[in-house]
Regions:
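Phosphate/pyrophosphate-binding active-site segments
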Residues: 2-3, 139-165, 324-423, 529, ...
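Conformationally flexible catalytic loops at phosphate/diphosphate-handling active centers
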Residues: 3, 149-168, 172-237
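Thiamine diphosphate
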Residues: 90, 101, 108-130, 137-147, ...
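Glycine-rich, anion-gripping cofactor-binding loops and their flanking helix/strand elements
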Residues: 83, 244-335, 434-463, 476-480, ...
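Active-site diphosphate/adenylate-binding microenvironment
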Residues: 9-17, 27-31, 35-36, 381-463
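N-terminal cofactor/phosphate-binding cores enriched in small/glycine residues
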Residues: 4-90
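A short, small-residue-rich loop immediately preceding and capping a beta-strand
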Residues: 22-26, 46-48, 66-105, 302-314, ...
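Glycine-rich phosphate/diphosphate-binding loops that line cofactor/substrate pockets in enzymes
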Residues: 11-21, 63-68, 181-189, 228-240, ...
Length: 586
């Protein structure tokens, strides 16, 4: 092992080891060499080399998504750091822990025309829950500091003994910073940023640690707030809706699921990314609600469907239709359960009960139950939609919607499915997938920019093989994600290529003209074939229903290389069929 002789770099590595932050994603550079070499030469760390920092950020996010532990990101100084920003914002809103460590020039070299320098302090602003700048060591390259002591970190009059005292204080302060910052990311499951100034030389190492760090951790797990059981909101209601957003599998125990399923006055709505598979819960939310908007008696129907008490669990809600419904037909009260952020998504105000959902329902369900049958209108509408859905799909020509209907029964069980944003995740929400699969999507910021990199990051830690289902724009946008030596042979990508942003065609007010085609839909004629070959993927293509059936038969079989299946569909036809789909369901 090689320990950097710069104390601050060595301290960071020792603290990451102490906190068991063992996954480290490193992008190349010279200013971060003390950290890169120190981490990579230590067998306790699993280090990944990713050149493109934007891709590296999402790759790290995918790792943390699966491990539920902070992943460390290490980059050099300058614009390299800024490329992390999209992933940092996504991690912040998806509540995924990351530790960003940026190497920097000493302060006196900033904004004087020195190379590869920018203002790195707090560049992520409110999108991290903590930023700290480590103090520069004074026992490393002391002469250089004194010669260019523009930041005055060493008084000119200091003697050797005073210099040692100053370094001891610097070490104590830096350890305090690391302790506080690492506890923040663990406690809040959000990203933090640590900026570290390094004076040259950067390539001096020793075989053994030259410092001893404190044993202090003072980290405690989150405690449930039992005072919530005294809330006046916990009482009998005729109509209770429990709405699950993005969540990991296992957020509800089987006993809790069984109890909720037996309550007629409680309706549970789940999204694809909720990873809840109980058949008595209502999925495919847009399929249930969107057609109701088209009915003449929509107001009467929505008043039947609206809850008195809304309980939300988990993260971001994907369905625009449930947001619209609950903003228009307001519940009396809104409670959010769990230690994650409570968001006032429905403009009603939200009471945050910081308690495990299983404990909450175990202790309070009897008080919430009533004899009113709130489930009946939901069951009736669900059955009606299911019949119309099946009838419409049976006569459907090859299109985006047809592709997703074919994937529904052909994705093998025990797959981790990563889904890109825009139309892809919204199509996914219209179907049921194998209950043994897990489904994830970057819904924190809902961007198309890092889906491939996130999926590859997830694949290195997932216990199941990983399938990415993505649209063409998202795939090409993040094509640098494929520039990665850590891709497993079991990794699969399905690209639905309709030659542009087809989702925009179904939005109200879209005009199908030259300007919209070029600047909104951004139509193109690109194929994924050459990218697949360049990055060592097996490539196949389907352009028809029969062709897709044949390709899917072999696509998931074990192979020596990862695979890309490109499915070509017609954008105009697909958008037209999706509009008619909701009309036919009403």
């Amino acid at each position: 092992m090689m320990y950097p002789q710069i104390n601050s770099a060595q301290t960071i590595i020792l603290y990451c080891e102490k906190f068991e932050f063992f996954n480290v994603v490193i992008s190349p550079g010279s200013r971060n060499a003390p950290l890169a070499i120190g981490f990579a030469s230590n067998d306790k760390f699993k280090c990944y080399s990713i050149v493109d920092e934007r891709s590296a950020g999402f790759f790290a996010l995918g790792i943390s998504q699966q491990t539920q532990k902070p992943t460390v990101l290490v980059c050099t100084s300058g614009s390299a750091l800024l490329n992390y920003y999209p992933a940092i914002a996504e991690a912040y809103y998806s509540e995924i822990p990351l530790v960003v460590i940026s190497a920097d020039r000493p302060n006196y070299k900033i904004d004087i025309g020195d190379g590869q320098t920018i203002q790195q302090n707090n560049v992520f602003g409110d999108h991290v829950i903590g930023f700290e700048n480590l103090f520069q060591d004074v026992n490393h390259s002391t002469n250089s500091i004194l010669e260019s002591n523009l930041q005055r970190i060493i008084p000119d009059s200091f003697k050797t003994t005073e210099l040692l005292d100053l370094q001891r204080k610097t070490q104590r302060d830096n350890e305090r910073i690391l302790l506080d910052l690492f506890i923040k990311t663990l406690h809040n499951s959000k990203p933090v940023h640590l900026n570290v100034p390094f004076e040259e030389p950067l390539s001096e190492f020793s075989d053994q640690p030259t410092i001893t760090i404190s044993n202090e951790t003072k980290y405690s797990i989150k405690k449930d707030d039992l005072s919530v059981f005294n809330s006046p909101l916990i009482k009998g209601y005729k109509k209770i809706m429990i709405l699950f957003g993005c969540a990991n599998k296992g957020i509800l125990s089987e006993s809790t699921i069984d109890k909720l399923s037996s309550c007629d006055n409680i309706v549970v709505l789940k999204e694809t990314t909720s990873n809840l598979n109980n058949t008595s819960f209502f999925g495919k939310i847009d399929q249930l609600i969107a057609p109701a908007e088209l009915n003449e008696n929509s107001s009467e129907l929505f008043n039947k469907l609206k809850p008195e008490l809304l309980i939300t669990v988990g993260g971001m809600i994907i369905s625009k239709k449930i947001k619209s419904m609950l903003r228009t037909y307001e519940p009396t009260a809104h409670i959010h359960l769990g230690h994650n952020d409570a968001k006032d998504t429905f403009y009603k105000g939200v009471e945050h009960f910081k308690i495990d959902p299983n404990l909450f329902f175990k202790k309070s369900l009897e008080k919430l139950v009533s004899n009113y049958n709130y489930k009946k209108p939901w069951i009736d509408i669900s059955k009606k939609r299911a019949l119309a859905h099946k009838k419409y799909l049976n006569k459907l020509p090859f299109s985006d919607l047809k592709v997703f209907s074919m994937l529904e029964s052909r994705i093998p069980k025990k797959y981790t499915i990563q889904v890109s944003n825009s139309s892809t995740i919204r199509y996914m929400q219209l179907f049921d997938y194998n209950p043994l699969c897990k489904v994830y999507c970057n819904r924190g910021t809902s961007g198309i920019d890092g889906s491939t990199s996130t999926a590859i990051g997830a694949s290195v830690k997932s216990a199941f093989p990983v399938l990415l289902i993505t649209g063409d724009l998202s795939f090409f946008y993040d094509s640098n994600g494929l520039w990665n030596s850590n891709i497993k042979p079991s990794f699969r990508i399905i690209v639905i290529n309709n030659n542009g942003g087809g989702i925009f065609k179904i939005l109200p007010g879209y005009k199908n003209n030259i300007i919209s085609t070029k600047f909104i839909e951004t139509r193109h004629e690109l194929s994924t074939k050459h990218l697949a070959r360049m990055h060592g993927f097996e490539y196949s293509k389907a352009r028809s229903e029969i062709g897709l059936k044949w390709k899917l038969y072999s696509f998931f079989k074990k192979s020596s290389k990862p695979g890309i299946l490109e499915i070509n569909t017609n954008s105009d036809l697909s958008s037209d069929l999706l509009k008619k789909y909701f009309i036919n369901l009403k």
